[in-house]
């Protein structure tokens, strides 16, 4: 516990808040190129084949990103836009691919929550 005099001399230094999405450099989205597209299995209580992609960003960082929605057209060398947001049951996956932007197509036949999956309004 510091004395009043020590606080007057030094003051308290505010704690640094560690970023949850360090590769974004405080940007809302970042562009990158897929270096590997693959599936992986989630943590213990869940079971599935989750679609993920390793992406090299424009700031030369490599991150693992989740591809949301049913079905995708991504492959190696696809140019994607990513946003922050982790996937709770996939360790190390802290980013999401934005659907319907750049080389990523929107989810086909999507009726609800379309804006999140880049789907156009059905006729």
UniProtKB/Swiss-Prot annotation:
GO BP term (any one): translation
Q: Which domain of life is it from?
A: Bacteria
Where does the record locate the signal sequence feature?
none
Q: Which UniProt keywords apply?
A: Methylation, Ribonucleoprotein, Ribosomal protein, RNA-binding, rRNA-binding, tRNA-binding
PROSITE patterns, sorted: RIBOSOMAL_S12
Residue segments, region Disordered: 1-24
Alphabetical list of Pfam families matching this protein: Ribosom_S12_S23
What spans are recorded as compositionally biased (Basic residues)? 9-19
Q: Which CDD domains match?
A: Ribosomal_S12
Instruction: Please list the GO terms describing molecular function.
Output: rRNA binding; structural constituent of ribosome; tRNA binding
The family database entries (NCBIfam families) matched by this protein are listed as: rpsL_bact
Q: How does it assemble?
A: Part of the 30S ribosomal subunit. Contacts proteins S8 and S17. May interact with IF1 in the 30S initiation complex.
The cross-references to PANTHER family, in alphabetical order and at most eight, read: 30S RIBOSOMAL PROTEIN S12 FAMILY MEMBER (PTHR11652)
Q: Which family does it belong to?
A: Belongs to the universal ribosomal protein uS12 family.
HAMAP family reported in the protein's UniProt record: Ribosomal_uS12_B
Please report the name of this protein according to its UniProt entry: Small ribosomal subunit protein uS12
